Amino acid sequence: MATIFDILNTLNNNNFKNCKRQCPINKSNKTIIDIIPSMDVTMTNDKLIIETELAGISKDDIEIDIKDSILTIQGEKKKNLNKQQQQLVSEKSSTSPSTLDSKEDEPSIEEFEDDIKPKSATSTTTTTTKENKDDENKTKSSDKKFISERSFGNFKRYLDLTKVLYQLDLNSINTQFENGLLTITINKKLHYSNTIKININ
């Protein structure tokens, strides 16, 4: 006879297969899964403990829910930008003009005539612009990656609790997230049974 540890071990090892076979898929909104986190599941005399490695992820980017006896842990591991990258992103967002503003800011015929410059001034401006672009390209190309092994993107992990759900008190769920380790603790019911006796009227 299989023990509770055998059941949980089977569920944990076959997690990806269970996900494909049992979990409902929303075809209209498919999400590409980039990371499948590692998980440890332990059953003690009075509780179920689920530990999931989520290093480098903020707790605000983690979602946990139980639906149709399936525990789902999902979210996104975002890539942190350095100061130079953040500055470039903010500059692009602040300098990109909108279509409406560009039409309103177009100069009139009189303004065109007043702003006509001699060819020498125009060529000087063009040269300066090219120099600025060259400086920007040099700055961008100064960052060189020698090793890139870290993974970023969406993560999701399923755990099918169907065979042990009758033992668990779902109102006692407790979660902790510390040092990249998510710990979910679910207490077992004081009195439980997988058999329901039905009286005949």
Curated annotation (Swiss-Prot):
The record's keywords, sorted A to Z, are: Stress response
Fetch the PROSITE patterns from UniProt: SHSP
UniProt KW RNA-binding keyword: no
Induction note: Down-regulated by Pseudomonas aeruginosa, PAO1 strain and PA14 strain infection.
InterPro entries assigned: A-crystallin/Hsp20_dom, HSP20-like_chaperone, HspG1-11-like
> Composition bias, kind Basic and acidic residues: at what positions?
130-143
Keyword Ribosomal protein appears in the UniProt entry = no
Pfam families in the record, alphabetically? HSP20
Region feature Disordered, mapped onto this chain: 85-143
Q: Where is the composition biased (Polar residues)?
A: 89-100
What range(s) does the sHSP domain occupy? Answer: 30-201
**What is stated as this protein's family in its record?**
Belongs to the small heat shock protein (HSP20) family.
User: What name has this protein been given in UniProt?
Assistant: Small heat shock protein hspG9
The record lists the lineage as: Eukaryota, Amoebozoa, Evosea, Eumycetozoa, Dictyostelia
